[in-house]
């Protein structure tokens, strides 16, 4: 993760990735790709998303990516005090690791 937690886009944000054309809607942050298995560590991504406007189309149709992969932010999702508190708590947890 190269982006600071407080700089992550909010859920509901819609982006286009570099080398991409289809908009994606972010529905989660700080996601892991699987459990890593016996001999490898799970890879962590900044975001998990689905196609927009289609939404979730089934298994294998979610997209994990990092902030640096974003080419364009089309829409910034909803932000409020609860989100700020959540990001502060998340940031504290990562600092402990």
Feature-to-residue mapping (PLM):
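Short, flexible active-site loop motifs that bind/organize anionic cofactors or intermediates
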Residues: 2, 14, 60
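Short connector loops at helix/strand junctions that flank enzyme active sites
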Residues: 10, 19, 44-45
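Short, solvent-exposed secondary-structure boundary/capping segments
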Residues: 32-44
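A general structural signal for short secondary-structure junctions and capping/turn motifs
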Residues: 7, 14-17, 40
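Short beta-strand-centered aromatic/proline hotspots
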Residues: 14, 21-32
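Intrinsically disordered, low-complexity, charged/polar segments
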Residues: 46-97
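Mixed-charge, Lys/Arg-rich low-complexity intrinsically disordered regions
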Residues: 1-11
């Amino acid at each position: 993760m190269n982006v600071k937690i407080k700089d992550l886009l909010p859920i509901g944000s819609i982006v286009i990735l570099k080398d991409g054309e289809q908009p994606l809607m972010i529905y989660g942050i700080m996601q892991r790709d699987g459990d890593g298995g016996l001999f490898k560590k799970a890879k962590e991504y900044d975001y998990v998303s689905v196609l927009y406007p289609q939404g979730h189309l089934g298994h294998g149709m979610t997209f994990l990516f990092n902030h640096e992969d974003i080419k364009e932010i089309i829409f910034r999702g909803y932000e409020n005090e609860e989100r700020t508190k959540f990001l502060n708590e998340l940031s504290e947890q990562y600092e402990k690791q």
